[in-house]
Each structure stands twice: as C-alpha cells, then as structure tokens.
UniProtKB/Swiss-Prot annotation:
A GO BP entry: translation
Protein name: Small ribosomal subunit protein uS4
Domain of life: Bacteria
Family membership noted in the UniProt record: Belongs to the universal ribosomal protein uS4 family.
Length: 206
C-alpha cells in the first residue's frame, strides 16, 4: 500500500478527529468541519458495526504515526510477543520510532517532516547518522540534529512550535544544542487518552 500524499485535513475528517498531521499547536479549527466526512457536503456516516469501529480505530492510529498497513501489522505481532499488555506494547513501539522521537523532541513540525529529516540524513543517534524512520530508539539513546542541518529554517521553526506544546516527560531536550535523550519508554498514562488500543487488539485477535 502506497503512502497517502493527499490533503492532510481529509484524513482527519475521515476519522472524525484531529490526527495532528499539520504543523501548529492549535487543534484544527471547527470551521474545517472535522466531524463531517470528506466531500463537498460530507456524506452522512453510517452506523458502524463492532468490526467497523475496531477498523476505524486501527486506521486512525496508523495514520497518526504515518505507518503503512504491513508495518502496522508487524508492530502488532511484535507487541503480542512481548511481555505485558499488547496494546500498550504496540503504542510504545510506535512511540519508539525514530521519526516519532524526532517529532516529539521538536526537531520536526510534524511526523511527516521528521520522517523527511531522517531520510535526508539530518539526524544522528548516539553520534551516528541513522536514515531509517522505523529505527527503534532505546532508553538513554541521544538523538541530535546534524551540524549542517541545524541552520535549516524548518528545524528552527519546528523548535519554536515545540515550545508551545506540552513537553513529553520521557524525553529530555536541549533545544539550544538541538539534541535530546530518550530517557525511557513512555507509559500509557503519558500518551493520548483519545486512542483506544484495546479496539486494535480486538481487531487483530480475531
């Protein structure tokens, strides 16, 4: 499945919630009719079956993190193999992706922009360039912006936006040096309550 390259707002309208795919700290404005389906008039959303609700939640989370279907399924399989709660393991794996960590640290205004920084070799982990967006960052790893990329206006703009967002407690960031430490894996209480990972587990458990 190819990565979606169309309007970001359309995805948020399809899911009926702000997926935070666009830069900025404000939620998408109500005039954008976030609860209305895509299209000129917004087709009325049919009542979903239990399966439909589970599928919708999976699609929402997959789009938030910008992960393709096969990748997402593999994350679920790995989460199921790990000890502990499968749903929480899944979210921890998604949060541990390098592109997501770069976004959380404020070096990219969106996860898509953070992914681009990684693929363009602008990001280092423990002093070594890593250009794989799905690379799993481990506790105590140091993630930094390469020296030649620190002058990029988009990185500076992203850091300014990040100052207005709530800072993740599992990360420690030095905005001046453009580097941060992944102190620990996030706990479930650290993450959005708007995600219902139990629905995803139910979907894949069938």
């Amino acid at each position: 499945m190819a990565r979606y390259l169309g309007p970001k707002l359309k995805l948020s309208r399809r899911e009926g919630t702000d997926l935070f795919l666009k830069s900025g700290v404000r939620a998408i404005d109500t005039k954008c009719k976030i609860e209305q389906a895509p299209g000129q008039h917004g087709a009325r959303k049919p009542r979903l079956s239990d399966y439909g609700v589970q599928l919708r939640e999976k699609q929402k989370v997959r789009r938030i993190y910008g992960v393709l279907e096969r990748q997402f399924r593999n994350y679920y399989k790995e989460a199921a193999r790990l000890k502990g709660n499968t749903g929480e393991n899944l979210l921890a794996l998604l949060e541990g992706r390098l592109d997501n960590v770069v976004y959380r640290m404020g070096f990219g205004a969106t996860r898509a922009e953070a992914r681009q920084l990684v693929s363009h070799k602008a990001i280092m982990v423990n002093g070594r360039v890593v250009n794989i967006a799905s690379y799993q960052v481990s506790p105590n790893d140091v993630v930094s912006v390469r020296e030649k990329a620190k002058k990029q206006s988009r990185v500076k703009a992203a850091l300014e936006l990040a100052e207005q967002r709530e800072k993740p407690t599992w990360l420690e960031v030095d905005a001046g040096k453009m580097e941060g430490t992944f102190k620990r894996k996030p706990e479930r209480t650290d993450l959005s309550a708007d995600i219902n990972e139990h629905l995803i587990v139910e979907l894949y458990s069938k």
